[in-house]
Amino acid sequence: MSTGLLDDLCEFYQAKATVICGALGEDIYSRYPFTEKVITLRKQKYSFHWYHLWKKIKGTRWDVLCDLRSTPVTLLVRAKKRIILNKNKKTSQHRVIGLARLNPYSRNTLPRIWLKKEDLNQGKDLLLGHSPPFFVICPSANWEAKVWPEENFTQLSKNIMNSNYFKGGTLIIVGGPGEEEVGKIIMKKLGKINIINLIGLPIIPTAAVFCFSKLYIGNDSGLMHLAASIGTPTIGLFGPTDDNIYAPLGKNTMVVRTPESSEELMSDPDFNHRTSGSLMKSLTINKVEKIAFEMLRKL
């Protein structure tokens, strides 16, 4: 969600950027036109990754240092100006609104993704032989508690693909590496529908596919934010996570959440972050479908 802030920082200070990010963000930030260098941070035992990062950046006196993680290592390097996000300050503000406090223009800038021509061509190649319009679902997430049940995604997909909005079109299933099984289950149950299973595809070609898609529906996940940043009409499904903070932001986005608030779901005495199953079961197919058709009517 910080790509919009990066854009404004580079514009305001007329600067090139060195971006430090995790492996998932490497391909995204390397395509930003003002990126000079990307340093990929990979976690190591005993937090040694911070020491290795310090060695890479300590030799430079930075004009502007922006730290969104409030890491001590950034205090150990030279910088003319420091912009630090205070992560200790609890807030119910959306993440992007929180980042506006660091924005030199004092504005909320929507996240965005930069793609090259060859990226878009790769997206087209992945869709060759399949008929539009394209409807994307992401039935997985990095945490089981925020996963809407597979059978709900299956029935929702069937209903939407049989509607006038997508008749003759293609269902696309996306997700991260290691989440392939749910895609296979949905494909088996929806045998008569044209489906492309792209679960496990790298982030850039996935983003390119989103560019040609009419609608995205998925759990609260990075791919949800990616779709919204691309400009794909996006519906995010929420339960144990707070949509006030993590809702998808873009030109055309909506949220559907469980009747219970995130606080109510997380305060259950039987809740266990590591072992609890889906907390999304109270979110009905009818509710999601209603919002989907409402969005489609406005497109």
Q: Where are the regions a protein language model picked out?
A:
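Catalytic machinery of carbohydrate-active enzymes
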Residues: 1-299
